[in-house]
Amino acid sequence: MPNSQTSNSQPQVSEKDVDTGFRKGDDTFTHWRNVFNILTGRMTDEGIEQFRVARDLRNEAADCKRCEDQRDYLLQWSPIIRYMSDSIRQLGGDLSSHNIYCRRCTNRKAGGFDPEYGILICANEMKDQGHLEDTMAHEMVHAYDHLRFKVDWTNNLRHAACTEIRASSLSGECRWAREFFRRGQWKLTQQHQECVRRRAVLSVMARPGCQDKGHAEKVVNEVWDSCFRDTRPFDEIFR
């Protein structure tokens, strides 16, 4: 009789069979079960992302409505947003509710600027009205720079680094209180500069022409002095 052969191969486990700790469902019990799994470390990074995506889809309409209401309020009453709007208008541009869009984003960012379309605000990433104000101001600095300096967004990393330095410095997102309470940065000295530099490097790293972190840091360093000192359209760093 022929010898029987025993297979040593293990059954393949598909991605669908992997337990990430995330449980589907919109009911209150399932929601808190997922929260408990996150708090106790029973949910993987993939599961946490699944939880966030499900939450964002469930809250999309409410998130966008809240974002639009706060956007309109800031356009009317926020000193920095009104000042940036006026400065952009003086250069022949126009940013208002018709081209500042509140949308659900699938990548984890606060917003973006496109010269053709305007400003995108990621409604599902906005923590509060202050966060929205910082994000709008940041993207408005990009819009101002595009109109005044003719930024080459595609091919010139120095241009990208300079406008990121200015946007992070002038928008208010790097002021001490924001860093301390929201991002857990505890330094008291040189905090503003370190925040601006860190965010500029991360932004340049995301550009197609950037090779690595070292390349991004080199580009940021090359333009740092002139771009950090340039506070236009403000006389000095606004906040």
Swiss-Prot record:
Q: What GO molecular function terms would the record report?
A: metal ion binding; metalloendopeptidase activity
Q: What are the record's GO terms for cellular component?
A: mitochondrial inner membrane
Q: Show the Pfam families listed in the entry.
A: Peptidase_M76
Q: Which PROSITE patterns match?
A: ZINC_PROTEASE (PS00142)
Q: Membrane topology per the record? A: Peripheral membrane protein
What keywords are annotated for this sequence in UniProt?
Hydrolase, Membrane, Metal-binding, Metalloprotease, Mitochondrion, Mitochondrion inner membrane, Protease
Fetch the InterPro entries from UniProt: Peptidase_M76_ATP23 (IPR019165)
Active-site residues annotated for this sequence:
139
E.C. code: 3.4.24.-
Where do the coiled-coil regions begin and end?
A: none
Which Gene Ontology BP terms does the record give? mitochondrial protein processing; mitochondrial proton-transporting ATP synthase complex assembly
Give the first-level EC class, as a single word.
hydrolase
Q: Which residues bind a divalent metal cation?
A: 138, 142
Compartments it resides in? Mitochondrion inner membrane
* Extent of Polar residues compositional bias: 1-13
Write out the ranges of the annotated region (Disordered).
1-22
Keyword Acetylation included in the entry's annotation? no
Q: What does this protein do?
A: Has a dual role in the assembly of mitochondrial ATPase. Acts as a protease that removes N-terminal residues of mitochondrial ATPase CF(0) subunit 6 at the intermembrane space side. Also involved in the correct assembly of the membrane-embedded ATPase CF(0) particle, probably mediating association of subunit 6 with the subunit 9 ring.
The entry sums up its family as follows:
Belongs to the peptidase M76 family.
User: Can you name this protein?
Assistant: Mitochondrial inner membrane protease atp23
Question: What organism, scientifically named, is this protein from?
Answer: Emericella nidulans (strain FGSC A4 / ATCC 38163 / CBS 112.46 / NRRL 194 / M139)
Upper lineage ranks? Eukaryota, Fungi, Dikarya, Ascomycota, Pezizomycotina
